């Protein structure tokens, strides 16, 4: 059974000129992992960074931090090997970006990374189901991918609930517009991993925000288990 409540800051809205220092601050503040958004300007209109930055972060931060790569790219097959060489831990690709998810899943595993599979708000969760037993994590987008600081889409929660019901041992991640006023909705629906960007990154005390999110998430998850 997927357990615990892991909080992963998204560095999308951080100062990219001081990215290493900001990531270190997040880890020192109690982050369970780092959520790194890779955008190519094709799959989504924005552009962020690629594997050279990930490789630099690994050298600066050491081997312990878990890098969850959210690959918002139109050719996810192209970047598996470079991200593996850069020592990414998990390669999360979008179901909408490939015609051969099974082949891509196999390639990611053969390159030594965990597999995440993401779906946009407009994609039915049932399309993810055939691959759920072959992946480590399902990412349910709660905003349209591509930019930070969007409003949380509560109508995505039935997707999370359906996945948790159908695949109880699967890690499920909510990503987009998640803060202290919305994290409980993700956890109550069944998410055990939460990505939060602005709520953490813009805070003068990120440790307190991370702890608050984790506590709210844990309480909501406990409530969910009692309500069964």
UniProtKB/Swiss-Prot annotation:
GO biological process: carbohydrate metabolic process; pentose-phosphate shunt, non-oxidative branch
CDD domains from the UniProt entry: RPE
Alphabetic keyword roster: Carbohydrate metabolism, Cobalt, Iron, Isomerase, Manganese, Metal-binding, Zinc
Highest rank taxon of the organism: Eukaryota
This protein's record includes keyword Cell cycle: no
Stated role: Catalyzes the reversible epimerization of D-ribulose 5-phosphate to D-xylulose 5-phosphate.
Binding site for substrate: 10, 70, 146-149, 175-177, 197-198
Catalytic activity: D-ribulose 5-phosphate = D-xylulose 5-phosphate
Keyword rRNA processing: no
Protein's organism: Homo sapiens
Free-text remark on how the cofactor is bound: Binds 1 divalent metal cation per subunit. Active with Fe(2+), and probably also with Mn(2+), Zn(2+) and Co(2+).
Pathway: Carbohydrate degradation
EC number: 5.1.3.1
Residues annotated to bind a divalent metal cation: 35, 37, 70, 175
Cellular compartments per GO CC: cytosol
Descriptive protein name: Ribulose-phosphate 3-epimerase-like protein 1
Misc: According to some authors, RPEL1 is a RPE retrogene on chromosome 2 which is likely to be functional.
GO terms, molecular function: D-ribulose-phosphate 3-epimerase activity; metal ion binding
Subunit structure as annotated in this protein's UniProt entry: Homodimer.
InterPro entries: Aldolase_TIM, Ribul_P_3_epim, Ribul_P_3_epim-like, RibuloseP-bd_barrel
Family label: Belongs to the ribulose-phosphate 3-epimerase family.
Active site per UniProt: 37, 175
Classification via NCBIfam families: PRK05581.1-4 (NF004076)
Cofactor needs: Fe(2+); Mn(2+); Zn(2+); Co(2+)
Enzyme class: isomerase
SUPFAM superfamilies, A to Z: Ribulose-phoshate binding barrel (SSF51366)
């Amino acid at each position: 059974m997927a357990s615990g409540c892991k909080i992963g800051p998204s560095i999308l809205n951080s100062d990219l000129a001081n990215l290493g220092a900001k990531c270190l601050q997040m880890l020192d503040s109690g982050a369970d992992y780092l959520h790194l958004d890779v955008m190519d300007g094709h799959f989504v209109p924005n552009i962020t960074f690629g594997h050279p930055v990930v490789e630099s972060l690994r050298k600066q931060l050491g081997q312990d931090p878990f890098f969850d790569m959210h690959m918002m790219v139109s050719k996810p097959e192209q970047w598996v090997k470079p991200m593996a060489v850069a020592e990414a831990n998990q390669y999360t690709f979008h179901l909408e970006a490939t015609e051969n998810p099974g082949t891509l899943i196999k390639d990611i595993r053969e390159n030594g990374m965990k597999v995440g599979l993401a779906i946009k708000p407009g994609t039915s969760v049932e399309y993810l189901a055939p691959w759920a037993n072959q992946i480590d994590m399902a990412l349910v987008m709660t905003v349209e991918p591509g930019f930070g600081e969007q409003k949380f889409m509560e109508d995505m929660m039935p997707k999370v609930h359906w996945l948790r019901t159908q695949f109880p041992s699967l890690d499920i991640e909510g990503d987009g517009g998640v803060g202290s006023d919305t994290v409980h909705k993700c956890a109550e629906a069944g998410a055990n991993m939460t990505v939060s960007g602005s709520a953490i990154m813009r805070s003068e005390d990120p440790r307190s925000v991370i702890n608050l999110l984790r506590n709210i998430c844990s309480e909501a998850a406990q409530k969910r288990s009692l309500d069964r």
